[in-house]
Structures are given as structure tokens and as C-alpha cells.
Amino acid sequence: IVSPPVCGNELLEVGEECDCGTPENCQNECCDAATCKLKSGSQCGHGDCCEQCKFSKSGTECRESMSECDPAEHCTGQSSECPADVFHKNGQPCLDNYGYCYNGNCPIMYHQCYALWGADVYEAEDSCFESNTKGNYYGYCRKENGIKIPCAPEDVKCGRLYCKDNSPGQNNPCKMFYSNEDEHKGMVLPGTKCGDGKVCSNGHCVDVATAY
């Protein structure tokens, strides 16, 4: 059963152009609260691309860029709504070829080390990642049926993340994070560059052309 639209309930329903509540409570200068229609001369009553009852000018930014792989969206000048959030395609090089776009982000190991440990912590030397071939409680590439699968030699940069700590008072060339509560935390993130033209996918270092 579909209830008929009710003007004044602050829900935009079928047949309504706006709904700002009852005439006594309406705070929207663009909307006629008695009819739930836009007032004469108004193009819109709400939305990220609605300013003073008019569509925002074409090109007005309505959603900021979150990363190099997630460009800003801009109003069209024909609608009160911001266009859908779109990303650059997965696999597009980013951050001066240090990474590849993945779902709107540019995952690189340096940023992941920074998120875990803060400043002065960087991606560790390749030798540190060899521990991921052990298949022990922390050094592995993925889990299958609860069993930790060791990394193949070519996949070691798609398992546990290793960082080099250069912060004051620290000298840890192979710093890693492990938690029993969250075993995924401290693993290299999917989509991270693991070699030239290669990214991490399901614990494997694969060609970026075939990953997506």
C-alpha cells in the first residue's frame, strides 16, 4: 500500500516540487508551503546547486575533489542537484606514476604507512617484505578458509605492509602493524602499486591491465 503524498510533512513526494513543512514552520523562501509548489520565479527549492531559488551557474563546484582520482563535480546550470560522483577509471596512473587510481583513491604505501604511524615513516626496503612468504600469523598474502596463505615471491608486496620508521628516537627498518582484533589492518590495500604496471588484487601482484 502506497500512502498518498501529504503536503507539509517535509518529505518530497510524488507531485510535489518542494515540501518545507507547514506554513507556520516553513523556512524555505522558494517554496509555497500551502501547495508544495515552487513560488513564482523560483527554479528550485533545495539541492547543492540551488542558490536563492535559482539554479547555480554552470561550472559552480558542488562536490570537492577528494583525491587526484576523484575530480570535483560542478553544477550544470540546468538542475538543482549536483551530478553523480564519478571517479577516474581504475588503473589510471596517479601521483606522478607512484600509484594507480582505485575506486577514487590513489593508494600508495607511503600514505598507508603515514596513516598507521604518522610522519617520518616511509615504505620499507624490499627485503622487509620477504617475511610475507612465511605464511605465519602476520606474514601472509591472504586467507582461504581461515588458513593464512604465504605470498609467492612475486606477490610479497601485496601482503603485510612494512614501513621504515625514521622518527626521532626510532630506528626500525621493518616496522609492521598487526592486531588480533582487526587482521586486515596493516595489510597492503587493494589497488596499491606493487611494481611497474602492477597492482595488488586479492593478495596477488597482477598486471594493472588485467586487474580491472
From Swiss-Prot:
Matching InterPro entries: ADAM_Cys-rich, Disintegrin_CS, Disintegrin_dom, Disintegrin_dom_sf
Compartments where located: Secreted
Lineage: Eukaryota, Metazoa, Chordata, Craniata, Vertebrata
Role played: Inhibits human platelet aggregation stimulated by collagen with an IC(50) of 420 nM.
Residue ranges of domain Disintegrin in the record: 4-90
Tissue: Expressed by the venom gland.
Miscellaneous field: Negative results: does not inhibit platelet aggregation stimulated by ADP.
Pfam families listed in its UniProt record: ADAM_CR (PF08516), Disintegrin (PF00200)
UniProt keyword annotations, A-Z: Cell adhesion impairing toxin, Disulfide bond, Hemostasis impairing toxin, Platelet aggregation inhibiting toxin, Secreted, Toxin
Disulfide-bond pairs as recorded: 7-26, 18-36, 62-82, 69-94, 101-106, 113-128, 151-158, 163-174, 200-205
Motif (D/ECD-tripeptide): 68-70
Protein name (Swiss-Prot/TrEMBL): Disintegrin-like halysetin
GO CC annotations, alphabetized: extracellular region; plasma membrane
GO molecular function: toxin activity
Entry keyword annotation includes Glycoprotein: no
